[in-house]
Amino acid sequence: MSPSTPRRIAMVGATGAVGETLLQILAERDFPVAELVPLASERSAGSTVDFAGRALTVRNLDDFDFEGIDIAFFSAGGAVSREHAPRAAAAGAVVIDNTSEFRYVDDIPLVVSEVNPHAIARHRARGIIANPNCSTMQMLVALAPIHRAAGIERINVATYQSVSGAGRSGLEALGRETAALLNFQDVEPSRFPQRIAFNLIPHIDAFQDNGYTKEEMKMVWETRKILEDDAIQVNPTAVRVPVFYGHAEAVHIETRDKITAAAARTLLQQAPGVVVVDERRDGGYPTPAVHAQGTDPVYVGRIRDDISHPRGLNLWIVADNIRKGAALNAVQIAEILVKSLI
């Protein structure tokens, strides 16, 4: 088939935040769609979603036959992917999975479209391609050009992750708690371990035996797999912040070869998917609300030499976690698939 041949698409989790954004981006980018089948749980079956100005009826995933589907996007949680993604792949669909279920399986590629698109070809082993964690993804879009030029040995990163990373319930919790506090009412935390409104929580996902959280360890495991370099040391701290959309990261790297902040800035200005916002003035840096929300690029600012290490650099990295952190990358993978692989 040619790249312009319309494809049959299944969208698992079509009623969720990532699923809705996937539908929007497929339409925005004129992806060649012959038929789009939105799928969800029995509870959501029968509802409608919008795609390119048309209302599509959501079908029940449990009894859907994937025969004839070319690409199946999965964005409904790990348990759903575990049960249904292999079934879709066995029927001949290429699965692009937005959960963590398959990221650490050796023969399933973990892909950031700007960083390791060559890995997509490895999908033939299992018929599944994994989308990375949103925080890993935006970090590596920015760091990969520097790694190729100077070799990154160590990454220290603190993330500032919006509540949309916890789904609709996270958005609702922040809105509800903020309204309550502004009305001088007491707040009992519901979605997060402590109240999220006007607060910072240094805890995302389950604690591991080594004291790190699973969210933090995802950044370790995924960075090494995507860059195909097990020697890279990654030291993360993941923090939930009272922002609706957009993740930010304070990143410090140590490189094998010396690279100056000026040279790194030039590399990043030429890097696909990156927009440099790095002016030494008030407001001359990217932020989630002003730059990232609702947009596609990974924004990088505060690029500066580390005054404490001869081969160190500091960067500030911001992106929309629902768009580039999940939905956009999945669509970019699909675009590469239809251009050259299926």
Residue ranges of each PLM-predicted region?
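N-terminal Rossmann-like NAD(P) cofactor-binding subdomain of oxidoreductases
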Residues: 1-196, 231-233, 266, 284, ...
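Oxyanion-binding "anion nests"
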Residues: 197-244
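A short glycine-/small-residue-rich loop at the edge of a beta-strand within enzyme catalytic domains
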Residues: 13, 187, 191, 207-214, ...
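A glycine-rich, Thr/Ser-enriched phosphate-binding loop motif common to dinucleotide/cofactor-binding enzymes
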Residues: 127-138, 211-220, 325-329
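C-terminal active-site/capping subdomain that shapes the small-molecule cofactor and substrate pocket
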Residues: 233-342
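Helix-loop-beta segment of a Rossmann-like dinucleotide-binding subdomain
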Residues: 123-130, 199-210, 315-317
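Short acidic/glycine-rich loop or secondary-structure boundary segments that cap or lie
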Residues: 165-168, 208-211, 243-246, 261-262
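A broad structural signal for alpha-helix termini and local helix breaks/kinks
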Residues: 150, 227-228, 255, 272
